[in-house]
Amino acid sequence: NLNSINDKKFTFIKGDISDSSLISKILKNYKPDKVINFAAETHVDKSIFGPEKFIMTNIVGTFKLIDTINLYYQDLDQNKKKNFIFLHVSTDEVYGSLSKDAPPFTEDHKYFPNSPYSASKASSDHIVRSFYMTYGLPVIITNCSNNYGPHQFPEKLVPFTILNAITLKKIPI
């Protein structure tokens, strides 16, 4: 739903998470107490044929973003620090593949990435966690599975499955 894009509470800023200068300006201008990182290169198959983009966005980009956010956080007064959270949206792909009889993944599972995509997301998770452990930056890491929504690329699992079902094609399992 893009109708709310015209709401005065919404501001769209085109940028790159690797642009520390831009991120710093945004933080100084808006003074957020919550930051959510949805930025990522996400297609497993594309990572196999072109991993560099995944490394640059998911690892280097996440590092530059969280490093800039940490500098912002360290300058906050104690009251604002109490309310600050950095939410890093990751993937269940960091845990590897499940066999048919295996129990579902939990946060206690060890990382076992199987592709450049999942390795880049696992690396970014470790970077984020290290900023919590080293600098005390409050972070939350989620390991979502097959997110979907409007305007999603049709090769992603949920839209691909739906399109195959309504056109009576084979559905992947």
Descriptions of predicted regions:
Residues 1-147:
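N-terminal Rossmann-like NAD(P)+-binding domain of SDR-like oxidoreductases, especially those catalyzing
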Residues 122, 147-160, 167-169, 173:
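Glycine/proline-rich active-site loop of Rossmann-fold NAD(P)-dependent oxidoreductases
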